[in-house]
Amino acid sequence: MTVQDSGKVALVTGASRGIGYGIAEALVARGDRVAITGRGEDALKEAVERLGADRVIAIPGKAHDEAHQAAAVERAMEAFGRVDYLVNNAGTNPVFGPMAELDLNVARKVYETNVISALGFAQQTWKAWQKENGGAIVNIASVAGVAPSPFIGAYGMSKAAMINLTAQLAHEFAPVVRVNAIAPAVVKTKFAEALYEGREAEAAAAYPLGRLGVPEDIGGAAAFLTSAQSDWITGQTLVVDGGIFLNAGVG
């Protein structure tokens, strides 16, 4: 299928698989050119092959590395001449357990990767293109950042911070750049499989829509928040959760 070029360019972090890949796929499908980042060079190469090497480039590196943040934006600018959209999807969640037993060094790692890296990419994109030319930023948060979730407190804490970062950047970058967040519930990815592995039907039964999320669900939301249809939306967190939060008001 031939896709008409939109003339827009997106940088999507953590996009070799899972939610990030789903977002990149949605943006490519509507005609954007996309730069994707990730740690694994082989996985990135495979992602580019699937998405289309004529429209996508890969930039390997660690999200929390400031040099990588700068280099990724620079490489995207060199390849495509602009970076209209930034999607901060890169994240980590290496620990499950109660906060009382949380290793503080692990907590720092989670915060650095999930929050500080998003700020770093936003700063670099702002300086390189968006300050003078406008655009949009989408931060991938989580429902765990909206309400507490058992055993993933470190992750939830970082995602709550990302939601606040979203509002702060929306205020500071207005009126030229819109900044919004997406807060998914459980999405079927390698990243989240510990939350449903071996019990998917049971986990899905808790959702009013009867299933867990898939990366395409988040891709569609990101495509909306980087489109003209959302031109009067900024500083918001779009919860994409299959209705799971509705259960809080039942009974």
Regions found by a protein language model. Name each.
Residues S142:
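Residue(s) in the substrate-gating loop at a strand-loop-helix junction
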Residues S16-G18:
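Conserved glycine-rich cofactor-binding loop
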Residues A122, S158, T166:
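Active-site helix of classical SDR
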Residues N93-F96, A147, A223, T234-G251:
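Short C-terminal tail/terminal secondary-structure segment
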Residues G97-M99, V106-R108, I137, A192, ...:
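Substrate-binding pocket helix/loop in short-chain dehydrogenase/reductase
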Residues L119, A181-P184, A201-Q229, I233, ...:
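C-terminal helical subdomain
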Residues K127, A170-P175, D231:
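Alpha-helical segment proximal to the catalytic Tyr-Lys
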